[in-house]
């Protein structure tokens, strides 16, 4: 085992001991530390075999964090795609979530817009954009804003 392989393994294990990473993310971080691509490939394969690296576990962890922070399904999909997680893994992580995205959108809208839903066109558009940015789709946004309006 060469010095490069040992240091790369140690770097990978240190990174994975702090939090889960996607394969792509781990690869990128090891490359930034200056490790050669062949060594990184071998180390990624090694940690995959040991079960220390799992895109499915990473996606599930990210899903929990996203929901806890009040972001929507589209935001979760976008973040996981940026980390190059496979589409079927993303679908599996979403299926494991027992969250009602409509109710989450309603909670986020209620928390953000304490003064209520605006009937002024520009303010209403601003509220819609905020919920879009948070990763909710139009049906969820419509439900959240109508539900918040009826709660007043």
Swiss-Prot record:
Q: What are the GO cellular component annotations?
A: cytoplasm
**Superkingdom, natural source:** Bacteria
State if Cytoplasm is listed as a keyword: yes
- Which coarse location class describes where this protein primarily resides? cytoplasm
| Keyword field | Cytoplasm
What's an example Gene Ontology biological process for this entry? Answer: regulation of DNA repair
| Subcellular location(s) per record | Cytoplasm
Family, according to the entry, reads as follows: Belongs to the RecX family.
- Function description: Modulates RecA activity.
User: What name is this protein filed under?
Assistant: Regulatory protein RecX
